[in-house]
């Protein structure tokens, strides 16, 4: 469960702009703010089942986008290589202020 | 015109998986293979107008995806910073084989 929440949060970070306003709202209440389905249902005055179905479909959409675009996967590959690069540069004493700064700028582009 | 073709090719590279089979086909004939609308119409046995409308809508979709996800923009920002980093490392004699290799791997993740 924790792993799924974590993955959904990450996918949401990358693809939320492709979701509808309603999808965004439900998913962020559920995964980011940890509301229960019942609480979200009350908040939006719709049935618990409607919330459940909507979130379920959104999860499928997010996985579909990831399958097609792979933004999360590429991000994680990049993170791993940035760490390796940083370790290599540090070990060789190559990580001076300028190099460090450029590397930081690179890492800040998600 | 050349600039637009170039941009459409780049956007197509990033977002083609989000297009329908037909959209992909028309756009790649038009922008990648430089067919005329008339030639594509003949190829698919539909009207020139239908091809035009479809490609026009696809262009709008590609721009919309870029607006929402910014994969091309981020790619270009990254390219620029990779060049800077490489220049800095080269100038300081820090670009040895290992560092070069890790950097190449990083650049190969689009």
UniProtKB/Swiss-Prot annotation, chains A, B:
Family matches, as Gene3D superfamilies: Winged helix-like DNA-binding domain superfamily/Winged helix DNA-binding domain
Pfam families, alphabetized: UPF0122
Cited SUPFAM superfamilies: Sigma3 and sigma4 domains of RNA polymerase sigma factors (SSF88659)
InterPro entries on file: RNA_pol_sigma_r3/r4-like (IPR013324), UPF0122 (IPR007394), UPF0122_fam_protein (IPR054831), WH-like_DNA-bd_sf (IPR036388)
Family from the record: Belongs to the UPF0122 family.
HAMAP family, A to Z: UPF0122
Biological role: Might take part in the signal recognition particle (SRP) pathway. This is inferred from the conservation of its genetic proximity to ftsY/ffh. May be a regulatory protein.
UniProt-recorded name of the protein: UPF0122 protein lwe1821
Species name: Listeria welshimeri serovar 6b (strain ATCC 35897 / DSM 20650 / CCUG 15529 / CIP 8149 / NCTC 11857 / SLCC 5334 / V8)
